[in-house]
């Protein structure tokens, strides 16, 4: 793992620096951390609690997904709040749980839509090899990016460091995410 520079650490929040140092000094090339992704399709199931009930231990990492961001009435709408709660669970477990987020980006501008590009008709607007910011599809992309940025800002403001994995299946093969 590359060493964090003093500048990176001075600019980072206290919790971000603590997480980075923990991963660098206690985990890198020494341990494997377990994790559990939360469900975005069924809010009635708490996957972390299921792991704890089955094993008597909490996973080190709890994963969340911005997949359903902005989709009213869908499960997984409260991923940010759940992640903040997981991080703050230190009161019960004696240590913070590590938060990771991914983003299965659904087709921009559609209510629902698929997240695999092969199943959508959406195209990134390009003009002469450059992103066309005047195209309506650009507005849809920007709107989605702004929604995610708002959620990441909530996490930052709550002091929650995030292992961020956006578009982790962008290469098209979920086997290697």
Predicted regions and their residues:
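N-terminal module-boundary/linker segments of secreted carbohydrate-active enzymes
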Residues: 1-85
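Substrate-binding cleft of extracellular glycoside hydrolase catalytic domains
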Residues: 71-177
């Amino acid at each position: 793992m590359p060493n964090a520079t003093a500048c990176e650490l001075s600019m980072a929040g206290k919790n971000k620096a603590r997480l980075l140092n923990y991963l660098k000094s206690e985990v890198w090339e020494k341990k494997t951390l377990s994790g559990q992704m939360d469900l975005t399709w069924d809010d009635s199931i708490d996957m972390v609690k299921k792991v704890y009930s089955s094993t008597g231990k909490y996973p080190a990492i709890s994963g969340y997904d911005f997949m359903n961001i902005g989709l009213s009435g869908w499960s997984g709408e409260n991923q940010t709040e759940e992640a903040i709660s997981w991080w703050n669970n230190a009161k019960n477990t004696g240590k913070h749980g590590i938060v990771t987020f991914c983003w299965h980006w659904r087709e921009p501008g559609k209510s629902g839509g698929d997240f695999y590009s092969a199943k959508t008709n959406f195209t990134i607007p390009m003009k002469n090899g450059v992103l066309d910011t005047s195209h309506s599809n650009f507005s849809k992309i920007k709107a989605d990016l702004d929604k995610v940025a708002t959620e990441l800002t909530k996490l930052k403001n709550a002091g929650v460091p995030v292992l961020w994995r956006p578009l982790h299946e962008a290469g098209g093969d979920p086997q290697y995410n």
